[in-house]
């Protein structure tokens, strides 16, 4: 959820999305969802000669699973806040894993097996 929240804060900013098929699209971030699907408006393809059919496209929806990189303007990235939230999320995940492990151990100790001879 960290990156989802981070991308939501960038709505309205210009970003470049590089796809796994080497197509790079620059546009204004209109929306992003929990699957990191991205909706861009006023797009420009970085290599118009290579992708001439994309010249007439003005808006696009990009499935999150086809994204290789998202290039962001440096001035829009608050690195300290991002690092703090990353640490907090990692700490919470570690705590949840520990609780899950304790529950699993407790269940296995409550289960008894009997054998008859």
From Swiss-Prot:
What protein family is recorded? Belongs to the snRNP Sm proteins family.
Any one Gene Ontology BP term: mRNA splicing, via spliceosome
UniProt name for this protein: Probable U6 snRNA-associated Sm-like protein LSm2
Q: What does this protein do?
A: Plays a role in pre-mRNA splicing as component of the U4/U6-U5 tri-snRNP complex that is involved in spliceosome assembly, and as component of the precatalytic spliceosome (spliceosome B complex). The heptameric LSM2-8 complex binds specifically to the 3'-terminal U-tract of U6 snRNA.
InterPro entries this protein is in? Answer: LSM_dom_sf, Sm, Sm_dom_euk/arc, U6_snRNA_Lsm2
Composition-biased stretches (Low complexity):
102-117
Q: Where does the Sm domain start and stop, copy by copy?
A: 2-76
Listed GO CC annotations: catalytic step 2 spliceosome; Lsm1-7-Pat1 complex; nucleolus; P-body; precatalytic spliceosome; U4/U6 x U5 tri-snRNP complex; U6 snRNP
Principal subcellular localisation of the protein? nucleus
Query: Basic and acidic residues: which segments have biased composition?
Result: 83-101
The annotated subunit structure for this chain is:
Component of the precatalytic spliceosome (spliceosome B complex). Component of the U4/U6-U5 tri-snRNP complex, a building block of the precatalytic spliceosome (spliceosome B complex). LSM2, LSM3, LSM4, LSM5, LSM6, LSM7 and LSM8 form a heptameric, ring-shaped subcomplex (the LSM2-8 complex) that is part of the U4/U6-U5 tri-snRNP complex and the precatalytic spliceosome.
Q: Which CDD domains match?
A: LSm2 (cd01725)
Q: Where is this region: Disordered?
A: 83-117
GO molecular function, one example? RNA binding
List locations, semicolon-separated.
Nucleus
Q: Which Pfam families match?
A: LSM
Keywords, sorted A to Z: mRNA processing, mRNA splicing, Nucleus, Ribonucleoprotein, RNA-binding, Spliceosome
